[in-house]
From Swiss-Prot:
Classification via InterPro entries: Compl_C2_B, Peptidase_S1_PA, Peptidase_S1_PA_chymotrypsin, Peptidase_S1A, Sushi/SCR/CCP_sf, Sushi_SCR_CCP_dom, Trypsin_dom, TRYPSIN_HIS
Entry note about domains: The MIDAS-like motif in the VWFA domain binds divalent metal cations.
Annotated glycan sites: N29, N112, N334, N468, N472, N652
UniProt protein name: Complement C2
Cofactor(s) needed by this chain: Mg(2+); Mn(2+)
Gene this protein is translated from: C2
Annotated site, Cleavage, chain positions: R244, K245
Gene Ontology molecular-function annotations: metal ion binding; serine-type endopeptidase activity
UniProt source species: Bos taurus
Length: 750
């Protein structure tokens, strides 16, 4: 062997002579901002810049430490010095039939634009708009219109130029953006028969602009709402513009395709947020009574099909969530590219295979609706144009003007600088009054979107057990079934909407008030205009209820059969503040629990009261949701025996079952909250699969924690006083409920 080669072969054996591990230079500070590293200074690490609100990183938001120990050089710029630049909003290029001020080349964050119309024209949209820290104007496009055409004046968004000034049937308008701005929405729109413009509004935005979570969440939240709102052909034919997003008849079927970017620029932590966001969407969709199949595709240089809609397990929420949870970040470890085309092409192949299945009925195939959710952090850089794959998908689904509602593509980009607005816009669906393409600043914003998107305000049918669980929802929105029952102006009891016209409450609320025409039921949030008072058309009190029935036995009060139904004089309009809760043993609850057809009331009880201690809730006087633990089985016995020790209330009681029968659920241990006087009749409820079910109603207790004047102040029980609370168990009063709610609710077999 050559002596020199021999020496070289031995070099790795000596630590002092070993090659040093590569690392990227540390001179990457950003002026005015900060940065984070996904894996230190090692090759493969992603550097992410961040700037204060109202500023953006320039020239890039991320950089990759390459395998040669050098930072990736930003494309399309010679500058490698990172700085935080101030955000600016674009200026109007033109404004028809009116004037605007001030006239600047661009506008700083916080700056205002004011619009005013000429005589004979009416202003539609926002008269004053403010530049927001994300580079977007708040409000809506200002338009001066005289209403003289078949379609309304489509307007000209800030920074846009329009060609076409005729708005009659069949007329077209075209848009382009001024220099350095990016067009999102439809570049061309046509005036249609129904007086609505095709496509979606053209908006011109700065390349570095992004969407706030509070803007994206309502759009996606409405998607879920209208997925449920289209419940039958009659409702579909209504001409109300409800902003239909992902839409499906409950008798139909939805194919949901989740496409998750796993390319090298996505860190492991960020990919976990992608997975978590997809899981939230899946969980929410499966919480409603619709038929859905889910496909999961991850992609980098190549796609990987985790789950196909052709598989039976794609219709099982547990299987879908397990598949999402078990996706391995390292599956695409060697994939450096972002191949959105191949990911969408995999969806196309899946659709084609389903359509050509031997047993697939052509009519049934035509009725399947399809929604594609793309989560990506970058521009497609290999595999060809993703738009080609979208066109193929539209062809196989026969998407035309009449069938446009059968396909929705949502393109969600994360990272305002390295996501291509133009590409996302080309991929997202274009439908009037809707948005399907979004860019969020970072994955944390994406997570916020899926936390806040659960808005049910647009659901017009009385689907049960749906509460708005987003972080910014009011107390009433979280428990929209909760109502207040009062004679004249004094509040005395609570109740729960169980349909759009019936309220379930406690019988003892009415023992001292015979003239029920004076009573009112307040539905909705008293802090909002949506609150409304209803008169009672009919009160159905359980004939078995008589609070003094055991007085001769030395028992001053007995609350057996403490249940009542109230029929309101009018139906309640469904909204985010007013919606019924699910009553167990009904068909609605069976669907919400995802139980099979043929399931029984006993099956519901096993599902909902399946432990000896069950976390549950009731609503306090101030609207807060408070926590209790319902006791069953052996724990029920231990819970109720405390009554024997309360000699103040029951001085001569020897058998606890004389006052606490098996009609009652028991709570009050484990530091539970205790209901106050005035909270009687309210629902005792629990959550399963993002839906809410009433298993009991507040009846009576040994201690009133609200003895003071303030309804916001709850005092702990004094020394020697053991609190216990008892709630009517709705599973024990099924015959009575079925007798009086027949034809109002559909019940499953006992």
């Amino acid at each position: 062997m050559d002596p020199l080669m021999a020496v070289l072969c031995l070099l790795p054996l000596y630590p002092g002579l070993a090659t040093a591990a590569l690392s990227c230079p540390k001179n990457v500070n950003i002026s005015g901002g900060s940065f984070t590293l996904s894996n230190g200074w090692n090759p493969g690490s992603i550097l992410t810049y961040s700037c204060p609100l109202g500023h953006y990183p320039y020239p890039v938001v991320t950089r990759l430490c390459k395998s040669n120990g050098q930072w990736q050089i930003p494309r399309s710029t010679r500058s490698t010095k990172a700085i935080c630049k101030p955000v600016r909003c674009p200026a109007p290029v033109s404004f028809e039939n009116g004037v605007y001020i001030p006239r600047l080349g661009s506008h700083p964050v916080g700056g205002n634009l004011s619009f005013e119309c000429e005589d004979g024209f009416t202003l539609r949209g926002s008269a004053v708009r403010q530049c927001r820290p994300n580079g977007m104007w708040d409000g809506e496009t200002a338009v001066c219109d005289n209403g003289a055409s078949h379609c309304p004046n489509p307007g000209i968004s800030v920074g846009a130029v329009r060609t076409g000034s005729r708005f009659g049937l069949g007329d077209k308008v075209r848009y382009r953006c001024s220099s350095n701005l990016v067009l999102t929405g439809s570049a061309e729109r046509e005036c249609q028969d129904d007086g609505v413009w095709s496509g979606t509004e053209a908006i011109c935005r700065q390349p570095y602009s992004y969407d706030f979570p509070e803007d994206v969440a309502p759009a996606l939240g409405t998607s879920f709402s209208h997925l449920l709102a289209t419940t039958n052909p009659i409702q579909q034919k209504k001409k109300q513009n409800l902003g239909r997003k992902i839409q499906i008849q409950r008798s139909g079927h939805l194919n949901l395709y989740l496409l998750l970017d796993a390319s090298q620029s996505v860190s492991k932590d960020d990919f976990e947020i992608f997975k978590d966001s997809a899981s939230r969407m899946v969980d929410r969709i499966f919480s409603f009574e619709i038929k859905v199949s889910v496909a999961i595709i991850t992609f980098a240089s190549k796609p990987k099909i985790i789950m196909s809609v052709l598989e039976d397990r794609s219709r099982d929420v547990t299987e879908v969530e397990n598949s999402l949870r078990n996706i391995n970040y390292k599956d695409h470890e060697n994939g450096t590219g972002t191949n959105i085309y191949e990911a969408l092409h995999a969806v196309y192949i899946m659709m084609n295979n389903q359509m050509n299945r031997p047993h697939m009925n052509p009519g049934a195939w035509q009725e399947i609706r399809h929604a594609i959710i793309l989560l990506t952090d970058g521009k497609s850089n290999m595999g060809g144009s993703p738009k080609v794959a979208v066109d193929n998908i539209k062809e196989v689904l026969n998407i035309n003007q009449k069938r446009k509602d059968y396909l929705d593509i949502y393109a969600i980009g994360v990272g305002s600088l390295h996501v291509d607005w133009k590409e996302l816009n080309n991929l997202g669906s274009k439908k009037d009054g809707e948005r399907h393409a979004f860019i969020l600043k970072d994955v944390q914003a994406l997570s916020q979107v899926f936390e806040h998107m659960l808005d049910v305000s647009q659901l017009t049918d009385p689907i049960c057990g749906v509460g708005n669980m987003s972080a910014n929802a009011s107390a009433q929105e979280r428990t929209p079934w909760h109502v207040t029952i009062k004679p004249k102006s004094q509040e005395t009891c609570r109740g729960a909407l169980i349909s759009d016209q019936w309220v379930l409450t406690a019988a003892h609320c009415f023992r001292n008030a015979e003239d029920r025409t004076l009573w009112r039921v307040s539905v909705g949030d008293p802090n909002f205009q949506g609150s409304k008072e209803f008169q009672i058309e009919e009160a159905v009190i359980s004939p078995g209820f008589n609070v003094f029935s055991k007085k001769s036995q030395g028992i001053p009060e007995f609350y057996g059969d403490d249940i009542a139904l109230l029929k309101l004089t009018q139906k309640v309009k469904m909204s985010t503040h007013a919606r019924p809760i699910c009553l167990p043993c009904t068909v609605g609850a069976n669907l919400a629990l995802r139980k099979l057809p043929g399931s029984t009331c006993r099956d519901h009880e096993k599902e909902l009261l399946n432990q000896v201690s069950i976390p549950a809730h009731f609503v306090a006087l101030n609207g807060d949701k408070l926590n209790i633990n319902l006791k069953t089985g052996s724990e029920w016995t231990n819970c109720v025996k405390v009554v024997l020790k309360d000699k103040t209330t029951f001085p001569n009681l020897t058998d606890v079952r004389e006052v606490v029968t098996d009609q009652f659920l028991c709570s009050g241990t484990q530091g539970d909250d205790s209901p106050c006087k005035g909270e009687s009749g309210g629902a005792v409820f629990l959550e399963r699969r993002l839906r809410f079910f009433q298993v009991g109603l507040v009846s009576w207790g040994l201690y009133n924690p609200c003895g003071g004047s303030s309804k916001n102040s709850r005092k702990p029980a004094p020394h020697g006083k053991v609190p216990r609370d008892f709630h009517i168990n709705l599973f024990r009063l099924q015959p009575w409920l079925r007798q009086h709610l027949e034809g109002i609710l559909n019940f499953v077999p006992l």
